[in-house]
């Protein structure tokens, strides 16, 4: 089940509500990534505390470990991981296609070796839909071929045409399995605007309830990603939610919303947190730097997260230097809280018709830098 209601537009920026089987989501929204069924360094209560509305699980990794037979015993991923809000799962395609020297691609699907034990495995649109049905994610993704940014036009066209055929197979399998959740299609086409439009027009035939923009943030220069988003954003159908996969920095989120994107996911806030890289309203802070050793201030004095309300930069510096697990947890709480705050502020700005003003102030603040 999926119902998307568009409440307000301000330029291309949108404010909406997405109703799914496990709850309602206010958009635009950022989805923390829980690759193996857990958002690294966070438990479900932490996620509730930072007001995360939906998380992402990784089909490929959960298929390999713990395996479908385990998750199925819990009625799906929600019961297995103890999370009662919506979950989106990717198709597994990105991870499989990343195994370039370990996989063989055909029209039927992709054969590859398990990086865990070397077993020969096969992933097709039908198998991906079966896995995601067992996971019982609120939003499943079609299986597609993710092409790198430097793909030639000929390669990109051939790839997107196969992804369209896989979209048709994904939808048929999803419906045959009587999956009660929602399936999104994925717009491909590499860095070619006309191919992106061709992909989008091809997907219209299948009437997916939501569409994702894939194949960005896969190694191309940032200006190229922005150029493509600038071109694709206005093409996306107004009545459906728009999801930008695997992106990105705070600035990327703001650019995406400004170009009509409703949903985002990225490992950046969690991965950077574990490496001591913290995002703040006034730029980024590297907590491992020696200058923070005696600093009594919080990460960001304007932040209301648990880490900023209770701990100093000095303590967080110490935890990071000592390799303490608590350091990774507090850093992650802060970064994900900051991302959720950005999204909430953008929702409010669109509602008030002041998104451009908010955007200008956001960039001014971020350029100022952290004291």
Curated annotation (Swiss-Prot):
Homodimer. Within each dimer, one monomer is responsible for RNA recognition and catalysis, while the other monomer binds to the replacement base PreQ1. The active site is at 90 (proton acceptor), 265 (nucleophile). GO terms for molecular function: metal ion binding; tRNA-guanosine(34) queuine transglycosylase activity. Binds 1 zinc ion per subunit. The keyword Repeat does not apply. It catalyses: 7-aminomethyl-7-carbaguanine + guanosine(34) in tRNA = 7-aminomethyl-7-carbaguanosine(34) in tRNA + guanine. This is Queuine tRNA-ribosyltransferase. Substrate binds at residues 90-94, 144, 188, 215. Its cofactor is Zn(2+). One of its GO terms (biological process) is queuosine biosynthetic process. Belongs to the queuine tRNA-ribosyltransferase family.
């Amino acid at each position: 089940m999926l119902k998307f209601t568009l409440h307000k537009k301000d330029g291309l920026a949108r404010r909406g509500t997405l109703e799914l089987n496990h709850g309602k989501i206010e958009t635009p929204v950022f989805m923390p990534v829980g690759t193996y069924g857990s958002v690294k360094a966070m438990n479900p209560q932490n996620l509730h505390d930072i007001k995360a509305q939906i998380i992402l699980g990784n089909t490929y990794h959960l298929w390999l470990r713990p395996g479908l037979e385990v998750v199925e015993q819990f009625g799906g991923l929600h019961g297995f991981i103890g999370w009662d809000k919506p979950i989106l799962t990717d198709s597994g395609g990105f991870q499989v296609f990343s195994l370039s020297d370990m996989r063989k691609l055909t029209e039927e699907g992709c054969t590859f070796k398990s990086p865990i034990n070397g077993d020969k495995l096969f992933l097709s649109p039908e198998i991906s839909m079966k896995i995601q049905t067992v996971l019982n994610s609120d939003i499943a993704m079609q299986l597609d071929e993710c092409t790198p940014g430097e793909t030639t036009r000929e390669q990109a066209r051939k790839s997107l045409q196969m992804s369209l055929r896989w979209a048709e197979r994904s939808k048929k399998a999803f419906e045959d399995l009587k999956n009660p959740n929602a399936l999104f299609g994925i717009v491909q086409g590499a860095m070619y605007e006309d191919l992106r439009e061709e992909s989008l027009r091809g997907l219209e035939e299948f009437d997916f309830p939501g569409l994702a923009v894939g194949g960005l943030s896969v190694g191309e220069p940032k200006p190229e990603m922005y150029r493509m988003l600038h071109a694709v954003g206005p093409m996306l159908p107004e009545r459906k939610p728009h999801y930008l996969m695997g992106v990105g920095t705070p600035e990327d989120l703001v650019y995406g919303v400004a170009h009509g994107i409703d949903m985002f996911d990225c490992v950046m806030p969690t991965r950077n947190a574990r490496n001591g890289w913290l995002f703040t309203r006034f730029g980024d802070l590297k907590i491992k730097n020696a200058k923070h050793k005696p600093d009594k201030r919080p990460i960001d004095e304007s932040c209301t997260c648990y880490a900023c309300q209770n701990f100093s930069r000095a303590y967080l510096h110490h935890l990071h230097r000592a390799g303490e697990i608590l350091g990774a947890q507090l850093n992650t709480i802060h970064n994900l809280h900051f991302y959720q705050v950005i999204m909430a502020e953008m929702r409010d700005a669109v509602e008030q018709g002041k998104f451009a003003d908010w955007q200008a102030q956001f960039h001014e603040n971020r350029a100022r830098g952290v004291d």
